Amino acid sequence: MDAKLLELLVCPVTKGPLRFDREHQELVSRSARLAYPVRDGIPVLLEAEARTLDDDELED
């Protein structure tokens, strides 16, 4: 994930920052407790496509 692109992207739900999880290929919004998939290098920032994070994942 391009660092400059990551600086521009925000969570569509909270407008907060996103963190790239390279292992899972996801953009993580801690404030929304959601992980958005990155498919073929393209972030899919749709709430319906995101998965909910559990407490253990938020501690990482």
Swiss-Prot record:
Q: Which Gene3D superfamilies match?
A: 2.20.25.10
The domain of life for this entry's organism is: Bacteria
Enumerate the InterPro entries for this protein: Trm112-like (IPR005651)
GO cellular component annotations of the record? cytosol
Q: Which family does it belong to?
A: Belongs to the UPF0434 family.
The record ties this protein, via HAMAP family, to: UPF0434
Q: What is this protein called?
A: UPF0434 protein Daci_3569
- Organism, as annotated: Delftia acidovorans (strain DSM 14801 / SPH-1)
